[in-house]
Amino acid sequence: MRRYFGTDGVRGEAGKPPLTPEFVLKLGQAAGAYFRTQEKRPVVLLAKDTRESSDLLEAALAAGLMSQGVRVEHLGVLPTPGVAHLTKALKATAGAVISASHNPYQDNGIKFFGPTGEKLPDEAEEEIERLLLEDHPTRGIGTVGDFREAERMYLDFLLAHAPDLTGLKVGLDLAHGATYRIGPKLFQKAGAEVMAFFNTPDGRNINRGCGSTHPEALSRFVVELGLDLGLAFDGDGDRVQFIDRKGRLFHGDHVLYLAALAFGEKGVVGTVMSNMALEVALKERGLAFHRAAVGDRYVLEKLKETGLALGGEPSGHVIFLRHHTTGDGLLTALLTLKALKALGGDLADWYEALPLYPQVLLNVRVSDKAKVMADPRLGEAVREAEARLGGRGRVNVRPSGTEPVIRVMVEAEEWAEEVARELAERVRALSQEAQAV
């Protein structure tokens, strides 16, 4: 069982275990030792987001890697999917990103990509964790460089997929994060009239009241300013949420439905959080629908298993496998707008084409996720909730892979909110009991 790597790399509060400079230095040494088993002279591309702790952790990770003879190429502030793309395009040994995605500024994280541009497989992360337990004396003096073409190369990749957006008025919520520079450049070059919001990072304002997890302000701006649509990215740019001209959230399930029809897909991979309405609508059109566990790495695994090319999550992580190896908010925005051009209409029209079942998602902060999830009384509570819905809805309770919370989701035509709140209270009570023991 992995101790440090979760569903999206190593995460935690910066400066506290495990994300201390000392630990990150050792992580760099262990990762460097692993990469030395893959190539004689490894090259690792290293990028970061805009958190105040990113510089410190970047320096520690780079030092650890270089102590093992690794060449480190600094990419500066760049969206996570840009690192994945460049790792593959430049045939680097690996890519690494200092970011905690949609989490608040106090948190940070480290994730690695392999030479194919995909996240490191579980076995590789397990081997790096094993190597963390060993001492790693200096095995050479690694060198460092600043790869100044990183943003331009990533921008060129994105523009190759961009439709002509001339005349489109777009609001961009950049979350004070990694897309704050490249986002406006991209949409302006594609011809759109751009209004950028939340694009002045100060190290502490990333995701604060903005971005894909807080699109309310963008929704208001779109309506008040008469924009055609809004795009809300998260802190590292691997997801996007859309706002239609009426200020409504056009989320990942809508995107999957629209893209599947526009691009002639044979089926779609969603997750256990995907709305039942998406599954029903796709099957009515003869398209397959498969559910994966939550997390883009599991969506990718299911895509490979089923041979499909389109998958994603309601949160805005969408993988267009013919074009990229990972979720990419900027690419998703471009391809969704291309799908609209192909089918006609705007986001508001397609929002109404897929009426979603009411869904309530509550996050319950807990002291010990594993203990609460293992409590048999939680299983009983879930079964009781399902019985109350009488087969006319779904219940899903799962631990977050990146935060100390358990997510309670209830989806039903009726009673969703009431059942979700009751179940969340049961989870909270079990957590308090576990903490008292």
From Swiss-Prot:
Cofactor note: Binds 1 Mg(2+) ion per subunit.
Modified positions (Phosphoserine) in chain numbering: S101
Matches recorded under SUPFAM superfamilies: Phosphoglucomutase, C-terminal domain, Phosphoglucomutase, first 3 domains
Active site per database record: S101 (phosphoserine intermediate)
MF terms in GO: magnesium ion binding; phosphoglucosamine mutase activity; phosphomannomutase activity
Domain of life: Bacteria
Entry keyword annotation includes Isomerase: yes
Documented EC number(s): 5.4.2.10
Principal EC category: isomerase
Binding residues for Mg(2+): S101, D234, D236, D238
Reaction(s) catalysed by this chain's protein: alpha-D-glucosamine 1-phosphate = D-glucosamine 6-phosphate
Role summary: Catalyzes the conversion of glucosamine-6-phosphate to glucosamine-1-phosphate.
Protein name: Phosphoglucosamine mutase
Organism listed in the record: Thermus thermophilus (strain ATCC BAA-163 / DSM 7039 / HB27)
